[in-house]
Regions:
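Short, basic/glycine-rich phosphate-binding loops at helix/coil junctions
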Residues: 181-183, 220-221
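C-terminal substrate-binding subdomain of Rossmann-fold SDR/epimerase-dehydratase oxidoreductases
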Residues: 199-338
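N-terminal Rossmann-like NAD(P)+-binding domain of SDR-like oxidoreductases, especially those catalyzing
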Residues: 1-182
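Glycosyltransferase donor-binding loop in the core domain
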Residues: 60, 84, 96, 195, ...
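The catalytic Tyr-centered alpha-helix of NAD(P)H-dependent dehydrogenases
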Residues: 30, 144-151, 192, 196-199, ...
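A general boundary/transition motif marking the beginning of the first structured unit of a protein
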Residues: 112, 190-195, 293, 312
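Hydrophobic, Gly/Ser/Ala-rich alpha-helical and linker tracts in large acyl-processing enzymes
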Residues: 184-196, 203-206
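Oxidoreductase cofactor-interface core, primarily capturing Rossmann-like NAD(P)-dependent enzymes
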Residues: 174, 185, 213-216
Length: 338
């Protein structure tokens, strides 16, 4: 299957590309490399022992996207591309809406131009907002608490409207929880630009000596140890979930929503302890005030993923931390200097 992968050089994109290549798909990675590196794609090619094409383009560049789809003629799309940093989002929302929402519209127009009717969208559990109950299932009310989550929700609604125009169109909305981990080889992993926004990459940079200490934002939540609880899912499990979703969309029309998580919550303190064990190093940390709009507990119901896709997460928190440490210790400065 010819699959166009937007954001294919990114953290989740590269791991999914590896799984797709192993499944004999023919991917084309499209990335503007604003928050990623071409080196990541070189490593995917080396690890898979497969050649594949990639091109540099922004989704908001309508002529470029039209040309790419006309040349490649994708049978399906996996859509990862988008800006993410929540703090920057709140400072500069229009740029993020343009990149994420307008970029998706241009992508769909380019797909329509060549009759491509299948798309798997990298959505997010942030669309749920504050829990009305736990675990979150796919029918939980939607009320995102930050602009990033709102863009994901807007795109979900756009994709629903797009799918409604043709019964042969198929959309899979994958709402995933907290991706962590790295490839078992240590060759590809999460390489954030600037200060990491996510917990585990920050811990890894502390462990390798790039940063002095970790700030734990709040230890007074209504949780067993007072720190926030999240559903951490290994990126390699997430990648196999995308391949399962791609297979489903190739056989079915309409719109489906599926959570990708482990169904288990882990606290910040538990993650720190697991990473210290994996790395053999202390993780200096200090308690800081809660961040605005942070949620105490956040974890998935995974029943639909099992029933619809035949998929479930298999790797543990210890696996996640061990693979991240392998990646970070082999690539202390990320891709450019690894």
């Amino acid at each position: 299957m010819r699959v166009l992968v937007t954001g294919g050089a990114g953290y989740i994109g590269t791991h999914t590309m590896l799984e797709m290549l192993a499944a004999d798909s023919t991917p084309l990675a499209v990335d503007n490399f604003a928050n990623s590196s071409p080196v990541a794609l070189e490593r995917v090619a080396r690890l898979s022992n497969r050649k594949f094409d990639h091109t540099e383009a922004s989704l908001t560049d309508a002529p470029a996207m039209r040309q790419i789809t006309e040349d490649f003629k994708p049978e399906a799309v996996i859509h990862f591309a988008g800006l993410k940093a929540v703090g920057e989002f709140e400072q500069n929302p229009l740029t993020y809406y343009e990149e994420n929402v307008s970029g998706t519209i241009q992508l769909l127009k380019a797909m329509d131009a060549v009759g491509c009717k299948k798309i798997v969208f990298s959505s997010s559990a942030t669309v749920y907002g504050e829990p009305q109950y736990l675990p979150y299932d796919e029918v939980h009310p939607l009320s995102p608490v930050n602009p990033y989550g709102r863009t994901k929700l807007f795109i979900e609604e756009i994709l629903r409207d797009w799918a409604a125009t043709d019964p042969q169109k198929s959309v899979m909305l994958l709402r995933y929880f907290n991706p962590v981990g790295a490839h078992a080889s240590g060759e590809i992993g999460e390489d954030p630009c600037g200060t990491p926004n996510n917990l585990v990459p920050f811990i890894a940079q502390v462990a390798v000596g790039r940063r002095d200490r970790l700030k734990v934002f709040g230890d007074d939540y209504d949780t067993p140890d007072g720190t926030g609880i999240r559903d951490y899912i290994h990126v390699s499990d997430l990648a196999t979930g995308h391949v399962a979703a791609l297979n489903y969309t190739s056989r079915h029309g309409g719109v489906e929503v599926v959570n990708l998580g482990t169904g288990r919550g882990q606290s910040v303190r538990e993650v720190i302890a697991a990473f210290a064990k994996a790395s053999g190093r202390d993780i200096p940390h200090e308690i800081a005030p809660r961040r605005r709009a942070d949620i105490a507990s956040f974890y998935a119901s995974t029943e639909k993923a099992k029933l619809l896709l035949g998929w479930q997460a298999r790797l543990s928190l210890d696996d996640m931390c061990r693979y991240v440490w392998r990646w970070q210790s082999q690539n202390p400065e990320g891709y450019e200097y690894g």
